[in-house]
Amino acid sequence: MKLTAIFPLLFTAVGYCAAQSIADLAAANLSTEDSKSAQLISADSSDDASDSSVESVDAASSDVSGSSVESVDVSGSSLESVDVSGSSLESVDDSSEDSEEEELRILSSKKSGSYYSYGTKKSGSYSGYSTKKSASRRILSSKKSGSYSGYSTKKSGSRRILSSKKSGSYSGSKGSKRRILSSKKSGSYSGSKGSKRRNLSSKKSGSYSGSKGSKRRILSSKKSGSYSGSKGSKRRNLSSKKSGSYSGSKGSKRRILSGGLRGSM
């Protein structure tokens, strides 16, 4: 009788222990799976973070390198201005200058009479440079205003071609026009590449094309010479008794001397 009463209690205890162990195992399995999935999710998120960081680094480096390449390309146009500095325009003695008029005098000789014209790739501007000792002439076209400036040293007299109602206006941008009006016969200048400039001191004066390798002829008489604007070319301004007169800006004069002969242009 006692044994028959104990058997149900034993079966009940064994069943409870088995159920509890099964529940514990299931909970342990669920926790391990959750931790593994969490690790996988965190690993995926870390991979995404590493990918995004790599992309951001690549984008920054590409942007920086691209801008540096562009800046190198922009500064590459300054090589021509370095080459331009080799030219020289020697000035005349101060004793022969007029005190009331602004003059620019250029002697034509093998050493000092060389003149170079360059057109940059971006603006097609025309630039003439000379050494520090000589009467320097700089024709600069800036990006903002496209202004024209002619400068010379104090010793050789200054020449400034200003844009006003009387002397004509100049715009440094491509295709713009500059008019230097000394008389009714004076010509026009277009700053774009391949345009023409006419300096008319008489009916026989020639034309000028601002592009590289073009030719400029400043004819004051039948004996005057020719000028080629390409690199390394020379300019000969030959004056004689029959040369004409030229007014560059407000009443100012430019004299181009060749040896003992003097003419005004």
From Swiss-Prot:
Protein's GO biological process: biomineral tissue development
Residues bearing PTM Phosphoserine: 163-164, 167, 169, 171, 173, 176, 182-183, 186, 188, 190, 192, 195, 201-202, 205, 207, 209, 211, 214, 220-221, 224, 226, 228, 230, 233, 239-240, 243, 245, 247, 249, 252
Miscellaneous field: The results of the mass spectrometry differ for the same peptide due to the length of the methyl-propylamine chains that vary from 14 to 18 units for the Silaffin-1A2 peptide (141-158) and from 13 to 17 units for the Silaffin-1A1 peptide (163-177). The species-specific pattern of biosilica pattern of diatoms may be generated by polyamines of different chain lengths as well as by a synergistic action of long-chain polyamines and silaffins.
Domain comment (free text): It is unknown whether the acidic chain located at the N-terminus is functional or whether it represents a propeptide.
Gene designation per UniProt: SIL1
Protein name: Silaffin-1
Application of this enzyme or protein: Due to its ability to synthesize simple silica nanospheres in vitro from silanes at nearly neutral pH and at ambient temperatures and pressures, it is of great interest in nanotechnology. May be of practical use for the fabrication of photonic devices.
Propeptide span(s): 20-107, 137-140, 159-162, 178-181, 197-200, 216-219, 235-238, 254-265
Repeat (R) residue spans along the chain: 108-140, 141-162, 163-181, 182-200, 201-219, 220-238, 239-257
Keywords: Biomineralization, Cleavage on pair of basic residues, Hydroxylation, Methylation, Phosphoprotein, Repeat, Signal
Function comment: Catalyzes the polymerization of silica spheres from a silicilic acid solution. It therefore plays a central role in the formation of silica cell wall of diatoms.
Keyword Phosphoprotein appears in the UniProt entry: yes
N6-poly(methylaminopropyl)lysine modification, residue list: K110, K143, K154, K165, K177, K184, K196, K203, K215, K222, K234, K241, K253
Post-translation changes: N6-polymethylaminopropylated. Two lysine residues of each peptide bears 6 to 11 repeats of methyl-propylamine, which gives a possible template for nucleation, and may also control the silica colloid size within the silica deposition vesicle (SDV).
Modification N6,N6-dimethyllysine occurs at: K111, K144, K155, K166, K185, K204, K223, K242
Biased composition (Low complexity): 51-90, 122-133, 142-155, 164-174, 183-193, 202-212, 221-231, 240-250
Annotated signal peptide: 1-19
Residues recorded with modification N6,N6,N6-trimethyl-5-hydroxylysine: K174, K193, K212, K231, K250
Quaternary assembly: Silaffin-1A peptides form large aggregates via electrostatic interactions due to intermolecular interactions between the negatively charged phosphate groups and the polyamine moieties.
7 X 19 AA repeat of S-S-K-K-S-G-S-Y-S-G-S-K-G-S-K-R-R-[IL]-L: region residues: 108-257
Compositionally biased region (Acidic residues): 91-103
Region annotated Disordered, chain positions: 37-106, 122-265
